Amino acid sequence: KGVEGVLGTDGIGITKTDAKGHYWLKSNKCYEVVYVILPSGYNVPTQAAMPKFWAQTSTDVDSEAQHDFELIQASNDNHTILVATDIHLTNRNLSPNDRQQFREGFVNELISTYTGKQNVYCFNLGDFAHDIHWYRNDIGWAESLNNHPSDDINGLPCQFWSTMGNHDNDGHTPSGDDVDLRASGPYRKMVGPTHIAMNIGKIHYMLLDDILYYNGYTGSNSNVDSQFGDCNYNAGFRPDMLTWIERDLSYVDKNTPIVVGMHIPLVNWDGSSRNYEFNNTSNWTSFMNLFKDFKEVNFITGHTHQTRFRAVPGYGTNMDEHNIGAVCGVWWSSSAR
């Protein structure tokens, strides 16, 4: 039976299902995906710990296609959110190997703690892989999630929802027009959309890509093997993503608590100002202003491999940031856990 009022999106436009659960969306297929914004009271099926909420589209803007999604009714007002970031699987010659450490440590701990519990979700805030090792050690997202799923997240007793980090971009993408979109192509093909939203219980969650990747070449980075550039980037949001965020939030009541996950922190380390990596002040301000009228907004971020809590300066008491430490610890090179 179709579900009425469910939001669907291509990462730019947003549409709503009719009384029969049907939707229609005209798309320029920029992101080559279509997906569901999870409605409250529902879950989606899981395959190897990955939520099945999206589908890949063709690049032909004139072709039509039908993509159906399964929703499973769930009483998820009471739920558990786990946050993981900076896992950095590299397949380097460590003893034990980092993938083995990840499986025997992080994955097994979650299995022993959460198996049998309902409505558990894990948010991955980026840098699951590590770009310079994609080609050096054959360890990209594809190897982690497709060719060897039993070695990594398969078996987790929770759904593994993700967004990108800077190291999840493909450094073999030549710089130039829309390099940010092109470099995220492997991620979108393997993992799914780079910016997503979901309503779980009475909370609205968003996972956003805040990496503007340009991969310029200065000749200064000797660590990138045969890549086309230096894997460099700025923090920020694509204009079409800012528009999408605004459209998504137009469906959210101002009193609804919001949790926003992304990779790069919004706030500088001492909490005094915006993070310097957001070098475009107007982009940062435009993003923050989208949330200023909501009663309670919490941002969860990674990237620094440190743990900090701070209020967002200039936005009263309704916005806080929780910067989360790295799953990889000291790059998987320490015996301490």
What is the role of each PLM region?
Residues 41, 52-56, 134-252, 278, ...:
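Extended active-site neighborhood of metal-dependent phosphoesterases/phosphodiesterases
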Residues 210, 261-266, 303-304:
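Short, well-ordered beta-to-alpha junction loops that form the rim of enzyme active sites
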Residues 249-274:
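Short acidic, glycine-rich surface-loop motifs adjacent to enzyme active sites
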Residues 24-34:
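Short Pro-Gly-centered beta-turn/loop motif in secreted/extracellular proteins
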Residues 3-26:
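Short, acidic Ser/Thr/Gly-rich low-complexity loop/linker segments typical of extracellular
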Residues 86, 126-127, 165-166, 263, ...:
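Active-site glycine-centered loops adjacent to acidic/histidine catalytic or metal-binding residues
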Residues 30, 41-135:
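N-terminal active-site segment of His-dependent metallophosphoesterases
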